[in-house]
Amino acid sequence: VIVLFLAIEDHRIAPARLAGSLHSAGIAVAALCLRDSMLGHSRYPFRLFELPTSRSFRGLAKALEDAVSTSGARWIIPGDEQSVALLQFLRLRRNVAGLSPGSMAVIEASLGNPCFFDACLLKSNTLRLASKLGIKVPRGFTVTSVGEAVARADDLGFPVFLKESFSWAGLGVVSCPDPISVRQAYIVKAKKRTMLPIRDLFRSLLGRHWYPTGTSIDIQSPISGQVVMFCGIAARGHLMGGICATQLECAYPQGPSTAVRICHEPEIAAAAEKMVVALGYSGFISFDFIKPEVGGEPVLIECNARPVPIAHLGARVGVDLGVFLADYLSTGVLPAKQICSQRSLEIILFPASLQPWPGLQGMCRDIPFDDPALIEFHLAMHPDLALAA
């Protein structure tokens, strides 16, 4: 069984770490990525296809066609949001993508229901769908002007978050303690939109209009509690298995986790399964929830239609997501029910695991000793990094 990673961004950890896990599960991994990237330095891909420097969808589609047909891949795993957006674009515009029927069939098998692509990628649409399913979401509004942003923030009560619908790793989120900060944050984001009609024309001419721009801006109330993520693998709207993890440390406020506790959260797993069924989803997926400090239902805050940095850890707690995928691709048979880990493990994630963490003494460290080039690549990118003993 062969799968292809598509990774447009060069720094993502999850695809590189997951490649080893899939290899251990009996899956052969090919990769279409930048050669000088985290995934490009992994020893596990049996074939590395060079991602073109141009971001024209025609060039990217040609590279994808070559990678799929040459490798014999039956499944594509997007490694980042840009890769998700590109695959969705090619699927929806099959008549102009220039892909063979065989490659298009692989894309179709690797994605969810096209009717719900936006709900996989855009935060506003994710929360709208979740709310319809009876899953609790933050109080909030989509806003279209600075005046509306300030008024809605005042309705919610300060502080609030101002969020871009297409963003990741907390980079599109601004914490606003008062009306002035809401106004300033909205103006900054709105400025990027003033030239959008002209920019979109040029992007269309260059074949770069697959990348989402001008997506909605939301105002949301913050929620006190712990971040709990659910990472799973699905096929045809059936969630085969997953793991939950509570965030113990993060890289920066609203940023990615650096240390987690893998745990059993049946209510969160059930909500994730509801979303997967509604999306008709196929592939690796994760959902971030806030578990309120004072009790009550977990609150869904976002969806990531790609592997996240805990995706390869399932084997440590008896729920190997790679094995689920290998079994499905080998047999076409889906497990009768979702299987989630009920074991616990506290672990510092790579690459944070290379650093000393005085407050996290005795915790397991996820270090890719089996793939040392990943360590070397990260250290070369961060030569001043203080290392753990």
Where are these regions (language model features)?
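Active-site nucleotide/adenylate-binding loops and adjacent lid/helix of ATP-dependent enzymes
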Residues: 117-216, 236, 266-270
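Phosphate-binding site of ATP-dependent enzymes
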Residues: 187-255, 262-273, 291-293, 297-299
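Glycine-rich phosphate/pyrophosphate-binding beta-alpha loops
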Residues: 167-170, 248-260, 304-318
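ATP-binding N-terminal substructure of ATP-dependent carboxylate-amine bond-forming enzymes
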Residues: 1-113, 147
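Short Gly/Pro-enriched turn/cap motifs at secondary-structure boundaries
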Residues: 164-165, 219-223, 276-280
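Peripheral (often C-terminal) accessory segments that flank ATP-dependent C-N-forming ligase machineries
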Residues: 323-389
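Conserved metal-phosphate-binding beta-hairpin within the catalytic cores
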Residues: 277-312
